[in-house]
């Protein structure tokens, strides 16, 4: 059996970071949105090989990006193991191989690894499920703070460490430019720097919520915010000039996406987004730039991680 699932990239329209909790995580107030950059994960059963104990994953390969682990540390591999453990029946299973095709910038603050985990959960659910949405979300939260959102998609408010999700109402599509850097940033390092700098927390999203209801792109852009910006700029000062270039080129607003170093720019139209993308590339300050729209999907069954194909 071969199952391919797809999951979108995310960006944060707002990321407010509160104090660190006893468990080491920070209390967050965030607004997630999927954009139509994506990864796919293909799970293939190796029917000639049965596994009675230990991981059923025997091989993991990645194309489209360098530096992504191809062993049990990969979040997709861990997603298989976590969901297999939830089976009621403990009979032997076929071994599986995983292949990840990357279209989301790696270590860029766009939840590429979390998207892979979410797509993998959908694939395993199609293989040996159904487990039910509640179980999938529970396992997703165990795997990582962004995995539940990648599973569900759309535009959502996230609290707790980002795993407590509520749908948000929006009007229309937003046009984005995604500017990726050649080298990623470690999320723990960014949060550590944030704690050192100790900037003011911004936990109120009421103005952004109202702007999203209007569909007015300029108004949405006015309220984009990320508390991790100062930390990301401290670790990667060159991001400041990237943000300045995007605004100079005509974007309504630009912010660091999540923990960075990817930056995203909100534009009035698809045409304007193309202009900003070309300006960023011509300036020679970014590794790659893409245009994207959000929220990513036009149909409810494709708004989050979802199955593309199943074949025997």
From Swiss-Prot:
Task: Provide the catalytic activity annotation.
Answer: 4-CDP-2-C-methyl-D-erythritol + ATP = 4-CDP-2-C-methyl-D-erythritol 2-phosphate + ADP + H(+)
GO MF assignments: 4-(cytidine 5'-diphospho)-2-C-methyl-D-erythritol kinase activity; ATP binding
List, alphabetically, the InterPro entries matched.
GHMP_kinase_C_dom (IPR013750), GHMP_kinase_C_sf (IPR036554), GHMP_kinase_N_dom (IPR006204), IspE (IPR004424), Ribosomal_Su5_D2-typ_SF (IPR020568), Ribsml_uS5_D2-typ_fold_subgr (IPR014721)
Gene Ontology terms describing biological process: isopentenyl diphosphate biosynthetic process, methylerythritol 4-phosphate pathway; terpenoid biosynthetic process
Task: Report any Pfam family annotated for this entry.
Answer: GHMP_kinases_N
Q: Which EC class is this protein assigned?
A: transferase
Report which superkingdom the organism of origin falls in: Bacteria
Q: In which pathway does it act?
A: Isoprenoid biosynthesis; isopentenyl diphosphate biosynthesis via DXP pathway; isopentenyl diphosphate from 1-deoxy-D-xylulose 5-phosphate: step 3/6
HAMAP family referenced in this protein's UniProt entry, alphabetically: IspE (MF_00061)
What is the protein name for this chain? Answer: 4-diphosphocytidyl-2-C-methyl-D-erythritol kinase
- Protein's organism: Corynebacterium glutamicum (strain R)
